[in-house]
Amino acid sequence: MLNQRQQYGRQGEQAAERFLKKEGYTIVCRNYRTPVGEIDIIAKDKTTLAFVEVKARRTESYGSPRLSITKDKQRKITRAALWYLKDTGQAGARARFDVVIVQGRDNSVELIRNAFDANLAAS
């Protein structure tokens, strides 16, 4: 059974998925788990694979969701993305990192394409 925070997180991922589909993305998979981390959503945006981190917050009482994408979190997402690319034989694929912020009781959605650079996250 999910607690309230987990339920809101799941609802946020569902809202993000609906939004991405409206934006023309094709969802490849959700909650891709690797030994080095998890990717919330992997989607195709035309010819580019997008590794999408979803941040869902009801309020900003714990700060802006943008601030929760720390360098450490970026490194984990990058490692998980590299694992996915290698595991699926797509090591040479064009890829980027997007963030979807789902916020408030109305689940307003903001998409940040190219939210961070994998090379900078590694440093």
Swiss-Prot record:
It comes from the Bacteria. InterPro entries: Restrct_endonuc-II-like, tRNA_endonuc-like_dom_sf, UPF0102_YraN-like. Coiled coil: none annotated. It holds the Pfam family UPF0102. Signal peptide: none annotated. GO terms for molecular function: nucleic acid binding. Belongs to the UPF0102 family. PANTHER family: UPF0102 PROTEIN YRAN. This is UPF0102 protein Dole_2298.
